[in-house]
Amino acid sequence: GRGACVHKDDDFHIIEEALMSADAVIVGSPTYEFAPTGNFKVVCDRIGPAHDKTFRGPAIEQGIAEGKDPSQYPDVRSTKPRVGALITVGGARTENWLSLSLPNMHEFTFPMGIDVIDQYKYFGAMNIEHVLGRPDVMERMKTLGSHIVEALNAETEEERIRYRGDEQGICPVCHQDLLTVGFGGN
């Protein structure tokens, strides 16, 4: 099938079309109690499995092979390469209150295979009335945008997906400091 969401009475189609058209995305969310907002999570859940490249790619190939009308299989733009950056903002004065925000925000990019090339945690947002009062943060956002442009203009796939963020983290894939310790040999 097409992999379309069963919910039709909202504006998700606007977000979906913007994503299908985009070569890059910069996604931001406030942090409430360690994590992104519930509304952000709902969008992630709506993208979720229905937009997963591992589902859509084979469904598109099968639809084309069977000579189906494009309206009968997922949007072919689903599998195009994209890059992204993530930004989370919290009012707390310590970074710890944002600890699960960026890891959770990867739920937005992961299903569609969007390569996250930069990310930023802006904490202490309540210390100054407006972000414009933080030249260091404004400069970092300018750099983040430049990283997106660099990735889009890259001549090789390796250079396109290269992580450009300041924080390398423990994980070599998501560059987060979140580490899961499993028991039972996993």
Task: Give residue ranges: language-model regions.
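Secreted/processed peptides and extracellular or luminal domains of membrane proteins
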Residues: 1, 11, 177-180
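Cysteine-centered iron-sulfur cluster-binding motifs in ferredoxin-type domains/subunits
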Residues: 1, 23, 172-175
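Charged, often glycine-rich, active-site loop that binds/positions anionic groups
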Residues: 1-5, 135-138
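Helix-loop-strand module that forms the ligand-binding subsite of alpha/beta enzymes
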Residues: 3-109
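Glycine-rich phosphate/pyrophosphate-binding loop and the adjoining helix
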Residues: 99-185
